[in-house]
Amino acid sequence: MIEKMILRRFFSTKSSTMRAWVSENGSGVELKEVPLPVINKPGQVLLKVKAASVNPIDVDMSQGYGREFLGTWKKIESCDAAASRFPLIPGRDCTAVVESVGGDVHNLAPGDEVMAVVPVILPGTHAEFVVTDSKYCSKKPSNLSFVSAAALPYVASTAYSAFTIARVSQRNAKQQRVLIHGGAGGVGSMAIQLLKAWGCEKIVATCAKGSFDIVKQLGAIPVDYTSDQATQELIEHAPFEVILDTVDSQLAKWSDNVMGVWRNCVHVSIVSPLMREMDKNGVPLGLVTTAMKHFERSFQSHLRGRWFSYAFFRPSSDLMSQLSRFAEDGKIVPVVEQVMGFEELEKAYEKVSQLNGRGKTVIKYD
């Protein structure tokens, strides 16, 4: 009876296998035929992927990044001390057509076109089918193609997570002045657009001079991070209530100097050492060394009434509903740099690994 309730409205596909890009041991990906994922919780949905973005975290995870954390999570979840994070299917977001739904899913039905994000503990979207929680899906904006919309969910979720930590939202963004390091990249360009959609007072973004046009179009004031005058320009735009690092640089670390003093200002970085420290030292010691680095990074800020924190990609149902609405209203526009075919994914990984993109790389499945 329980099984029937969980699988209510589940419609099986014609095949029991699919093609997926798989990392077997953390040394890259290869295209394989693997079992089709199945719904095993009543709130999940099975999606037929139409397009997916490629993000630096996908490339890193295919090379073993996060193996200690994810391996430990799998052991706890499965109650199996021998469980491993491999084989791994990367990919954290997609656009798709709903193939089937669990028994508790009432807001989606087979045939619906959606945008979706997938938690890192689940097999990813660089496959023909994927399972995720229905709360991490939203209707694909009708004015966007599958390819364009696929550029939105992961970067929006990451930026939203950082702004949640910084206590910036639609309710208070109008009073905020924000500095974004890496404004032309995937997360940076989305962060600018979220802030503009929320009515943020002032946004300054560092980027290469060749990306000034993109940053200006999105609604931010560009500053060339390679210029000798970069620090002086930031001082002229200061003070900032919030700083977001989407890249790691000396300028990003220095920019604590342009935050407001004794105003509870926040510096957030999505470039966290946590996963690498755990991969290097194991989970317990990795947590300790990360905490030490966090303390070292934030101590001086606390002395002046400011604080520092790391942020991570975290799926959010609240964000997904906002994202669809903003995209349909034209307040958020996908920034797609390059589109490649499903069988070109290794080439896409190589491109994204260079970390010099002006927008997103998207994989089109058919």
UniProtKB/Swiss-Prot annotation:
Q: What happens when the gene is disrupted?
A: Under hyperoxic conditions or low temperature (16 degrees Celsius), lifespan, body size and fertility are severely reduced and sexual maturity and egg hatching are delayed. Slight increase in the number of apoptotic cells at the embryonic comma stage. Also shows strong susceptibility to UV irradiation and paraquat treatment. Does not show increased sensitivity to X-ray radiation. Increased sensitivity to P.aeruginosa PA14-mediated killing. Body wall muscle mitochondria appear enlarged and abnormal with less developed cristae in hypoxic or hyperoxic conditions.
Q: What is its EC number?
A: 1.-.-.-
UniProt cross-references to SUPFAM superfamilies, sorted A to Z? GroES-like, NAD(P)-binding Rossmann-fold domains
Do you know which Pfam families this protein is assigned to? ADH_N, ADH_zinc_N_2
Q: Which UniProt keywords apply?
A: Mitochondrion, Oxidoreductase, Stress response, Transit peptide
Task: Name the organs or tissues of expression.
Answer: Expressed in pharynx, muscles and intestine.
Q: What residue intervals traverse the membrane? A: none
The highest taxon in the source lineage is Eukaryota
Molecular function per GO: NADPH dehydrogenase (quinone) activity
State its location(s). Answer: Mitochondrion
Keyword Oxidoreductase: yes or no?
Answer: yes
Q: Name one process (GO BP) from the record.
A: response to superoxide
Transit peptide: give start and end: 1-20
- PANTHER family assigned: ALCOHOL DEHYDROGENASE RELATED (PTHR11695), RETICULON-4-INTERACTING PROTEIN 1, MITOCHONDRIAL (PTHR11695:SF294)
**Protein name, please?**
Reticulon-4-interacting protein 1, mitochondrial
List the source organism. Answer: Caenorhabditis elegans
